Each structure stands twice: as C-alpha cells, then as structure tokens.
Design a protein with these regions (language model features):
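Secretory-pathway glycan-assembly enzymes, especially type II membrane glycosyltransferases
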Residues: 1-297, 301-304
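Active-site rim elements
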Residues: 23-26, 380-381, 410-414
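Short, mixed-charge aromatic SLiMs
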Residues: 57-71, 426, 449-461
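A short acidic (Asp/Glu
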Residues: 60-65, 271-275, 308-319, 406, ...
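Surface-exposed intrinsically disordered loops and tails
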Residues: 121, 128-133, 138-143, 155, ...
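Catalytic lobes of large eukaryotic enzymes
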Residues: 276-387, 429, 433-439
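A donor-sugar binding/catalytic signature common to diverse glycosyltransferases
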Residues: 386-447
Length: 463
C-alpha cells in the first residue's frame, strides 16, 4: 500500500483514528465488560477500537497472545463495535508516515479531593507515563510501536464521588467523558505541539487508555445520543470463546455426561464458613444423586489449587489470601467425598485433559510448548487463564450446575460463596441454552436439567 497519511488498516467505513485499551483492570470475565465499555466510548468518539492481547486472565497491550487466542475474533464486531487487532494496529504504526500522534488517558475511581470529579493535565511529566502511576508500562512506547506521544500531555479523568449509585449518574459521567475527549478547550490545554496557545490543536490519532473504572459509564443510548449517524450497538453480551476452547469443553462434557458441574469460589469467603460449607456441599451432592440417579461424575471448578495444594491458586488474586483453613477444609472435603458421595466420581479439568481428544490446534500448540520447555506442558502452563475459560465452558454444558449461596447482608453467615461474575456468565449461558431447548419438541442427550442450584451453610435444600 501507499504508506502515506491515507494508509489505514480499518474495515471500510471505519475511521482511521484509534482507541487502545492499553491496560484494563480486573480479570477476564469482568475485563470483557470493561472492554465493551471502551468499545462504546470508541464509537462515541468516532474511533476504531484496538483489540488488546491476552494472557493469564488479563487483557492488555503487554501480552503476546492475540485477542483471538481467548475469544472469537469478531466478538466485539458482533455487538456493533468497530475493531482491528493489535497486530494490525502495530503494523499501521510502523508503516504510517508521519508517525501517529498519541495521548495517554487514565480513568480510575473517584478521588477524595475531587468530590465533583476532575480532569488533570500533566504538562510536565514524560508524556508516555500514566498519571499517578509512573511504573505502569502501557507497552506502546518505541520500539514496540512508532507512536509519538510528545505532542500531547497525559490526561487523568476522575468521576464524581458516588457517580455509580444510579444509572443516571453513571451515564451522565460517560457523556462528560465523551465531551472532555472531544473538547477543543481541553485538547488545546493538553497540547504540547507548540509553545503558542494560539497554535491549532489537532486530535491525536491514538488514545491509549489506562482503564480502572469498575462501573459501566456507557450504554448504546449514549452512543446514539452523541453520534446519531452510527448504527446503535447491541447491549453487552459475554464474548463467545475461540472455537478451540468450546470444542475442548464439548469433548470433556461428552466424556462425563450426564454430570454435575460445581463452581465454588472461596476467595473472600469467611474462613470459618469453609468447613461447614464443605459438609453442606456433600449433602447437596447426595440429594442431587438421589434426584438424578444416572449422574456418575462431578466436575469441580474452584479457585483453590485442588490438584496440588502447594501449587498456584487458580485465581491470581486468591493466591494472596489462601489460608490454612482453606487447606484443612479441602483436605476434609476430598477425604469425605470418597466415603459419602456414593456412586459419584470427582474430577477437574487437570484430570480430564489427559483423557479427552484434544482439538488439533491445541494439540499442536501443546506439543510446541512442550518441545520448547523440554518437558510436558499442560493447558495451565500454556496460559493460566485458559483453565478458567475451559471451566466456564464445561460448566455451561453440564446437565446440572451447582454453586454456593452468596450470603449478603444479614445472610452473610450462611454464605458458601461470594457474588461472582464468573458464575453469572455460566448461569446466563445456561439460561439461554435452556430457552433454546424449550423451543424444541424432542429432548436429546446433553440437554440441561437446571440453570443453577445452590447450597449454603444451613443445608443443601437452598435453591
């Protein structure tokens, strides 16, 4: 292609101006929601979203696996968000002449000193640094890309105190963010292109985001309000996973069917609840076995490293808070399962991956990784985040799904889990599949028998 200012890798009709999610807070399940938020923001600013790379249940420009390693490559496009891959974006930055201009934008939680919200323009520091977080590497500086940050000072945008307590407050803040990033006044003050304040301001080609908000600030209605010419995007839906992971999950589910899948999130669960919850879970399994006699297998997905208690927890954040009570509770659970769960066999993905037929692409990837490491490499060693993805995909396909009761407020003492977006994604997928089943006249093997069942400290009958 002609490598002048008109060279652009976007799809027809998509603008050659970009929003890059350089760093996203939170792990994979919630990071999907945050990426969708930035996709809506990109649309509102008439920009194209760059799909971040992925690894270890995180989404960031700093990782080596492409977005399509976890998800369907067109996951955001299916929702009406215009995207390109990070590889396409980097290639564009290398070929474009002149070098693309860029600006760092940081969005974090409310700040006590800015009760009404605020915009900070850091006109003195290195323009490639994240305001107030100088050690955070966005992985967009040379030689990673040819982006030129020198012409624009970093921006930090803070929401008003309590903005998240109402939908109006959240979306109102979202509209103000769109106005801020479109504002000639803000843009002029953040420009370093000339010492003269009268110099014309040009929007940067690229906005590089450090995004740490926990609550949604954008909705399709905001996009339609600020840019009515753009077709309205669809509401958020969890991204479909790459076919290699859904094929693998289908193979595992077929080998276990009919089976119960359990998601037991113990992170932040009160340690005194662990032992009684484990006992209650065993009673619940016995009840389900009597209700569904054909079930012989139980698939356990948990953040506790049940295969190797001395190993790494399945959740990166949980690894910091695992206690001796966790170890005691799970040792007791495993020992009691063998005695009390008559007719049931307990398994995990770590045990199943050696028993099922692996998709060709995965088998080749594991063979390559094993050759490079000089020893056999499993899925968790290939990428620790894949364990959670496959656990979710398997649980979505189980005939029966079981999770702990999330005790809140006065019922906290009964809790055997905490509210989890991981669990919510499984339940939503199961409800959608059950809805599809109800439209069929004939029942077939592999259909779901419930959307979710729960157990609590007080007993197994709490659905």
């Amino acid at each position: 292609p002609d490598l002048d200012d008109d060279y652009c890798p976007t799809r027809p009709g998509a603008p050659c101006a970009f929003l890059v999610p350089a760093w996203l807070g939170e792990q994979e399940t919630k990071a999907q929601m945050h990426l969708y938020q930035l996709g809506l923001l990109a649309l509102s600013l008439n920009r194209t979203l760059v799909l971040p790379n992925v690894a270890k249940s995180r989404l960031s420009c700093c990782y080596h696996n492409p977005f399509s390693f976890y998800y369907a490559a067109d996951a955001l496009d299916q929702l009406g968000v215009r995207t390109i891959s990070q590889a396409e974006f980097v290639e564009w930055s290398e070929k474009r002449d002149p070098a693309p201009s860029a600006q760092v934008v940081s969005m974090v939680g409310a700040k006590a000193t800015y009760l009404a919200g605020a915009i900070e323009i850091d006109s003195a520091s290195d323009p490639t640094l994240v305001p107030n977080k100088p050690t955070r590497n966005l992985c967009l500086k040379a030689p990673k890309t040819r982006l030129d940050f020198s012409g624009h000072s970093p921006l930090a945008i803070y929401p008003p105190e309590g903005y998240h307590r109402s939908e109006a407050g959240r979306l109102g803040f979202g509209e103000s963010v769109v106005n801020t990033l479109s504002s000639p006044e803000v843009g002029g003050k953040s420009s370093r292109a000339s010492a003269s304040r009268d110099a014309p301001y040009e929007l940067p080609n690229v906005l590089a985001f450090n995004y740490e908000l926990r609550f949604p600030i954008m909705a399709p209605s905001v996009v339609s309000l600020v840019l009515p010419s753009v077709p309205p995007p669809l509401p958020f839906a969890h991204f479909p996973y790459s076919p290699v992971w859904t094929d693998l999950a289908s193979n595992v589910a077929a080998s276990l069917s009919p089976f119960i899948a359990i998601h037991w999130r113990t992170e932040t669960l009160a340690p005194p609840n662990l032992a009684p919850c484990a006992s209650s879970l065993l009673r619940k399994l016995s009840l389900l076995k009597s209700r569904y006699p054909s079930i012989k297998n139980v698939y356990l997905a948990t953040d506790y490293p049940i295969e190797d208690p001395s190993g790494i927890a399945h959740s990166g954040t949980f690894a910091k808070v695992v206690t001796e009570q966790h170890h005691q509770a799970f040792r007791a659970f495993l020992k009691s399962f063998e005695k009390e769960a008559k007719g049931l066999s307990l398994t995990t993905f770590a045990r199943e991956q050696g028993r099922v037929v692996l998709p060709d692409a995965l088998r080749e990837a594991l063979a390559t990784a094993s050759a490079e490491a000089g020893k056999p490499v499993g899925l968790g060693e290939l990428d620790a985040g894949l364990m959670g993805i496959v656990d979710k995909a398997v649980a979505m396909r189980a005939e029966v799904f079981l999770t702990g009761f999330a005790g809140v407020g006065k019922e906290a003492a009964l809790g055997c889990a905490k509210v989890s977006s991981f669990t919510s994604q499984i339940i939503e997928a199961r409800q959608a599949r059950i809805g599809e089943q109800s439209a069929k006249e004939d029942q077939v093997r592999g259909e779901l028998w419930n959307d979710v069942s729960r157990w609590s400290v007080k007993g197994p009958d709490d659905d």
